[in-house]
């Protein structure tokens, strides 16, 4: 339970903005209360809200984050990663021109079936070389995503994370889209490729 909460707080791809002030808050749950307003810095220019969810049946953890965003990150809008073993990492990003943005609610997980494609599956914390399992892609998931990065904290220090799994399309996420805390969050690998089609044995 605690590990899922930590992972939720790690995967926040947000950025500060220019000539704008936005509400800043972070909380486990569907929403976060008002914490403080912070002036954003170049090159980002919009306020935004990120909703994150990690669901590993039967457990589900959600977190909410308001911060300053870059327009390039706002275009990402959402992501859904099937990391295998009935585990999903999902995010919804909503940007606006106001200090306080209201995020869009999560839709329910689709009742989809395996489609014959597979990807390496990892939802790893504290290591960029976490053990892989096979993620059986479902529905329209035909791409494999691989994201590796580091979260730098005073304690316990650098925290590595590694996400691999099935996605329906490759997100417009590049190494240049680093988080607002460049000294604290380092996105070092983003790869996306076609999933492997498994041929049924005769």
Swiss-Prot record:
A Pfam family assignment: PLA2_inh
List of glycosylated residues: 177
UniProt entry tagged with the keyword Nucleotide-binding: no
Keywords: Disulfide bond, Glycoprotein, Phospholipase A2 inhibitor, Secreted, Signal
Keyword flag Phosphoprotein: no
Covalent S-S links between cysteines: 22-47, 25-32, 40-68, 74-95, 96-101, 119-144, 137-166, 170-192
Gene Ontology cellular-component terms listed: extracellular region
Localization of this protein: Secreted
Cleaved signal peptide residues: 1-19
Example of a GO MF term: phospholipase A2 inhibitor activity
Coiled coil: none
Post-translational modification: N-glycosylated.
Spans traversing the lipid bilayer: none
Tissue: Expressed by the liver. Not expressed in esophagus, stomach, pancreas, spleen, gall bladder, small intestine, rectum, kidney, trachea, lung, testis and body fat.
Family: Belongs to the CNF-like-inhibitor family.
Family matches, as PANTHER family: LY6/PLAUR DOMAIN-CONTAINING PROTEIN 8, LY6_PLAUR DOMAIN CONTAINING 9
Subunit structure: Heterodimer of subunit A and subunit B.
Purpose: Inhibits the enzymatic activity of all phospholipase A2 (PA2) groups.
Name the record gives this protein: Phospholipase A2 inhibitor gamma subunit A
Organism of this sequence: Elaphe quadrivirgata
Lineage: Eukaryota, Metazoa, Chordata, Craniata, Vertebrata
């Amino acid at each position: 339970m605690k590990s899922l909460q930590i992972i939720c707080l790690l995967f926040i791809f947000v950025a500060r903005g220019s000539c704008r002030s936005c509400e800043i808050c972070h909380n486990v749950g569907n929403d976060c209360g008002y914490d403080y307003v912070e002036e954003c810095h170049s090159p980002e220019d919009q306020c935004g809200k990120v909703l994150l969810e990690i669901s590993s049946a039967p457990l589900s953890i959600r977190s909410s984050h308001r911060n300053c965003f870059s327009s390039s990150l706002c275009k990402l809008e959402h992501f859904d990663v099937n990391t295998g073993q009935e585990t999903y990492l999902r995010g919804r990003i909503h940007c606006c021109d106001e200090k306080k943005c209201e995020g869009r609610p999560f839709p329910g997980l689709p009742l989809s079936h395996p489609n014959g494609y597979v990807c390496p599956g990892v939802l790893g914390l504290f290591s960029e070389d976490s053990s892989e399992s096979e993620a059986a892609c479902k529905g329209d998931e035909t791409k494999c995503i691989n994201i590796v990065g580091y979260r730098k904290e005073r304690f316990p220090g650098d925290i590595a994370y590694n996400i691999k799994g099935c996605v329906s399309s490759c997100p417009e996420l590049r190494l240049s889209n680093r988080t607002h805390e460049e000294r604290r969050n380092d996105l070092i690998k983003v790869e996306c490729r076609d999933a492997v089609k498994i041929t049924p044995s005769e």
